[in-house]
A protein has these predicted regions:
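Blade-level signature of beta-propeller repeat domains, shared across WD40, Kelch, NHL, RCC1
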Residues: 265-312
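Hydrophobic alpha-helical segments and helix pairs
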Residues: 99-151
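Blade/loop signatures of beta-propeller domains
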Residues: 13-20, 59-63
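Conserved beta-strand positions in repeat-built beta-propeller and related beta-rich domains
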Residues: 30, 45-59, 96-103, 140-146, ...
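A short beta-strand motif characteristic of beta-propeller blades
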Residues: 22-27, 72-79, 114-121, 158-166, ...
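Short loop/turn segments that connect beta-strands within beta-propeller blades
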Residues: 68-72, 108-113, 152-157, 202-206, ...
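A short loop-to-beta-strand structural motif that recurs across blades of beta-propeller domains
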Residues: 57, 61-66, 103-105, 147-149, ...
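Beta-rich, blade/repeat-based domains predominating
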Residues: 30-41, 62, 80-95, 122-135, ...
Length: 319
């Protein structure tokens, strides 16, 4: 996710000069500063801060997790004080792991009344952002300290202690498949530098980050296309989405058909041919059809049909 203070400066920017950002539909539901999406049981989980103001370090205890499925929204994890600023999520062996400020909170999906467990990270590692798992090890990115931690979760009831695993500039979104980790880099201080790119780590036992995509940005969410031939990456500056071909390395801007500009695309996910893009400051989730056709006139741009899940926010700061 991006950090407080940046959202409003980006609101007037468009993705690319020829983008046509128009809203095709708005569905009002129950979201409040949604940062992350995650496929779950035929639907999508959405993590919300629920706070009075947009603050990724808030300690208000108003965070909650919604479950969107078949056009309906229900509450999976209520705002009961267990979460404050929930971000990246992971479901493994009947447990839901959720990033929060300086910690990871673990909920049992089988025993909903059970108290959640807390895995604390070392002091100062505040912006715990995203999670992936491989062979019983959980990997957690911390954007403000340039670290990715690893811990053993083979026994969910007795998780290991988080250990520093590798250093990557501003690690934000994580994506892991077949032992290869992809990392979206975001500048914690808001100042984009050459090393804020998309990285790949091909060997988890001997981690060595390599630049996969050279263009710097404020990258947040990262997800595979349904055919696993490309990556979708969200960017806060300029606000939008790009598609990176994993075979050629070519990056293509995706043209979203929106009327209200995308402001803060956070932790995206792909499920059943649709891309879910949480627009954090606007408290909404864009649902984008993944089927794209290359525009002959442009040669490099794609157009996406889309509709909006603009979840009800009574104090929407950008309304």
């Amino acid at each position: 996710m991006a950090f407080i203070g940046l959202a409003f400066t980006l609101s007037a920017q468009t993705l690319w000069a020829d983008s046509n950002l128009k809203v095709s539909e708005i569905i009002r539901q129950d979201l409040r500063f949604c940062e992350s999406t995650y496929p779950y049981d035929g639907g999508i989980l959405v993590a919300n801060f629920g706070s009075g103001q947009l603050d990724p370090l808030n300690a208000e205890g108003k965070g909650y997790i919604n479950w969107y499925k078949n056009g309906k929204v229900s509450t999976l994890i209520p705002a009961d004080g267990s979460l404050s600023a929930p971000k990246g999520m992971l479901v493994k062996d009947g447990y839901l792991y959720v990033c929060d400020v300086n910690r990871i909170v673990v909920f049992s999906l089988k025993e909903r009344t059970a108290r959640p467990r807390t895995i604390s990270l070392p002091e100062g590692n505040l912006f715990v952002n995203d999670l992936v798992e491989w062979n019983g090890s959980l990997y957690a990115s911390v954007t403000n300290t340039d670290r990715i931690f690893r811990l053993d979760i083979s026994d969910p009831m007795n998780p290991g202690t988080p250990q520093e695993w590798v250093t990557v500039p501003g690690p934000n979104g994580l994506l892991l498949d077949n032992g290869v980790l992809y990392v979206a880099s975001y500048p914690a201080d808001g100042n984009t530098r050459d090393h804020h790119v998309v990285y790949r780590i091909a060997d988890l036992e001997h981690p060595r980050p390599e630049k996969l995509f050279q263009t710097s940005g404020q990258y947040d969410g990262i997800a595979f296309s349904s055919d696993h031939k490309a990556l979708y990456v969200s960017n806060w500056n300029p606000a939008g989405l790009i598609r990176i071909d994993l075979q050629t390395g070519q990056a293509t801007p995706l043209v979203l058909d929106l009327e209200t500009p995308l402001v803060g695309p956070a932790d995206i996910s792909v499920s059943e041919g649709k891309i879910y893009i949480p627009d954090l400051p606007n408290s909404r989730v864009l649902v984008v059809e993944e089927s794209v056709q290359q525009q002959a006139a442009k040669g490099k741009n794609y157009r996406l049909s889309s509709h909006i899940l603009d979840y009800y926010c009574p104090l929407n700061i950008l309304s």
